[in-house]
């Protein structure tokens, strides 16, 4: 009976450790995805802020040659 208790406790302990590791990896993956989304959004904002400058440059060139 004592052997079965020890085996059961060992199985439960190893299961909890495994579950903890999986949850930690999942959390890290979610954090990396969130960081990637934030990076993508900031790149998009930078690109969108350049559009008016590009339009002004094109219109200035057109006025110069036109």
From Swiss-Prot:
Highest rank taxon of the organism: Eukaryota
Keyword Nucleus tagged: no
Tissue localization of expression: Expressed by the skin glands.
Region called Disordered, residue ranges: 24-44
GO cellular component: extracellular region
Pfam families recorded: FSAP_sig_propep
Subcellular localization: Secreted
Compositional bias segments (type: Acidic residues): 30-41
KW Secreted (keyword) present: yes
Modified residues (Phenylalanine amide): 65
Propeptide: 23-44
Biological process (GO), any one: defense response to bacterium
Keyword terms, alphabetized: Amidation, Amphibian defense peptide, Antibiotic, Antimicrobial, Cleavage on pair of basic residues, Secreted, Signal
Chief location category: secreted
Signal peptide: 1-22
Function as written in the Swiss-Prot or TrEMBL entry: Has antibacterial activity against the Gram-negative bacteria E.coli and P.aeruginosa, and the Gram-positive bacterium S.aureus. No hemolytic activity.
Family: Belongs to the frog skin active peptide (FSAP) family. Phylloseptin subfamily.
Protein name, UniProt field: Phylloseptin-H5
Species, as recorded: Pithecopus hypochondrialis (Orange-legged leaf frog)
Gene this protein is translated from: psn7
